[in-house]
Amino acid sequence: MNRNEFIARLKENGIPPEIVSFDSSINDGYNIRKNKLRWETFTRERGKEYNCIGFPSESDALQHMLDELIAIYARNIVEPQRFQEYS
């Protein structure tokens, strides 16, 4: 997966791409960056980084971030089955 595919998948799931920052952004929110030896995903809040996870490729990092964001924000969740009452 590349960045364009990642952004398209976010949009498909009703997630605004603006919540993700790339590279050495100082924005709060969700971040993906290339470190010296690996790609990293993490969240930044009030200038502090949390939940930093390393990956061998950008594609792996993007897939992980997509999975996490879909689990949190996706609006296309299957509705629970409704049970019929029998008389």
Residue ranges and their predicted role:
Residues M1-S24, P56, E79-E85:
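Negatively charged, low-complexity tracts enriched in Asp/Glu with abundant Ser/Thr
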